[in-house]
Amino acid sequence: VLFAGDGGLQMTIQELGTIFQSKIPVKIVLLNNSFLGMVRQWQELFYDRRYSFTEMVNPDFGLIARGNGLSYRCVERREELDEAIAAMKASEGAFLLEVRVEGEENIFPMVPAGAPVSEIRFE
């Protein structure tokens, strides 16, 4: 199972073609917050929310997934998640599960750039 953000997936989206061509049954959970999430998080935590070039207008990931031979499902509410995960697990081939999440939800823990692991941040 691959967990990826929408920004990260778009940087390597051509690999969906490799998955299709090679018939790799990978399961992808796409955490879509419509931001370059880690960059936005840094700008929030270390630069007083002075956001620059982090908000994204995303393509239709369902069309892209299906166009590359992957099954696809989109979750917009927490209540839909269990059923969508079950569908993904039951799928024999490659599957893209898009989970739309809050735009300013942060990912922790994280280690600031240049800092030792002992300075890990949990909030």
Where would I find each of the regions flagged by the language model?
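Thiamine diphosphate
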Residues: 1-123
